[in-house]
């Protein structure tokens, strides 16, 4: 499984289509929360399983994963911009099906919270990744 290819495909789709003025933070990137809006991205994949019987080189494997998009907006801006950004991100992937690598988004959920500095929204986008080997 080449998780790098999955990461690149998913992250690139969001970054290429993002229309808001928020800093985007990738996994394992050192980051101090700025005094501005920002978005944190992360992705996880399970170990997967073989889903077809076939000779070697033609066996299809399925991996399930979750893409996390966490949006932070300053309290002084109100909660609407946070909601708009996370909903835009979810809409970018709703029922999306990529080829090479094959990735199909299947489900999403969003939760909101606030702390002393930010409104934040966490989108969990579930997907299946298929690989033939």
Where do the model's predicted regions map?
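Alpha-helical context
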Residues: 45-47, 58-69, 101-105
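Small/polar-rich, solvent-exposed N-terminal microdomains that initiate assembly or binding
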Residues: 1-59, 77-80, 84-88, 96
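Oligomerization/assembly interface segments of phage tail-like spikes and tubes
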Residues: 59-75, 119-130
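Short Gly/Pro-enriched loop/turn and capping motifs at secondary-structure junctions
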Residues: 74-76, 111-112
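Acidic-leaning, charged glycine-interspersed low-complexity segments
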Residues: 20, 87-133
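Sterically constrained small-residue positions within well-ordered secondary structures
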Residues: 32, 60, 112-116
